[in-house]
Amino acid sequence: MPVNLSMTPINKAKAWGVHAVTASGVILALLALLALVDNKPQACLLWLGLALLVDGLDGTLARKYEVKEMLPHFDGSVLDLVIDYLTYVFIPAIFIYRYIPLPEHFELLAVGVILVSSLFCFCNVNMKSTDNYFVGFPAAWNVVAVYFYVLDLHPWVNLATVLVLAALTLTRMKFLHPFRVRQFMPLNIAVTFVWLISSGLLIVQQPADLPILLGLWFAASAYFVGICLWRSAREWFG
């Protein structure tokens, strides 16, 4: 990629600043883990949600400030993957083990499936399509944990969901990356923020009967499911 910015100390400092934004995710991971230790599930999910937002934005900043070209000796993608495994997979897996009902004697199996299947996702060099959709379920167990917590599903439904999503990791099904997919990007980002805000409010107010907020949350969720199925169907059926 050609370098459009000059290699000045200020531009290099900006690039390091972007890496600092990415690195802040490990502090958020620590806060989420400490919330688990302190038996504060809502705080844990909120810290993970903030980490999700940081992860969604740092890539945009990295491209804007040409971080890879400014600092070729420091691989921000490795930094990102390390933090993502903590905030998308490892801590959510512990959260699910501790707070989400699973069938008796199947708890460790479910968590093990989450951890191992996610390793494939993180090591898959073909995890992105040419139009920046994720190929296969992108190990977004932080998002899954929110659904489990808010919906309070039956233990067997939770286990089946874990197994199905883990299996989808190995498929060619497309999953939206709202900050990278160019098509419908403004709408994708708007719906993402609707989902994030409504999720945060539902987490804070659990358990609560909030039909309007739940309706908004489900509508945003339905949009994501719909666009993923639409993009996958385009490939399946030409």
Swiss-Prot record:
Q: What class of enzyme is it?
A: transferase
List all topological domains (Periplasmic): 38-41, 97-104, 154-155, 205-209
From the Swiss-Prot or TrEMBL record, give the protein name.
Answer: Phosphatidylcholine synthase
Task: Please provide the record's keywords in A-Z order.
Answer: Cell inner membrane, Cell membrane, Lipid biosynthesis, Lipid metabolism, Manganese, Membrane, Phospholipid biosynthesis, Phospholipid metabolism, Transferase, Transmembrane, Transmembrane helix
Tell me, which GO biological process terms does this entry list?
phospholipid biosynthetic process
Q: Give the EC number.
A: 2.7.8.24
Its UniProt entry gives the catalysed reaction(s) as: a CDP-1,2-diacyl-sn-glycerol + choline = a 1,2-diacyl-sn-glycero-3-phosphocholine + CMP + H(+)
Q: Which GO terms describe its cellular component?
A: plasma membrane
Supply the InterPro entries for this chain: CDP-OH_P_trans (IPR000462), CDP-OH_PTrfase_TM_dom (IPR043130), PcS (IPR026027)
- What's the source species for this entry? Pseudomonas aeruginosa (strain ATCC 15692 / DSM 22644 / CIP 104116 / JCM 14847 / LMG 12228 / 1C / PRS 101 / PAO1)
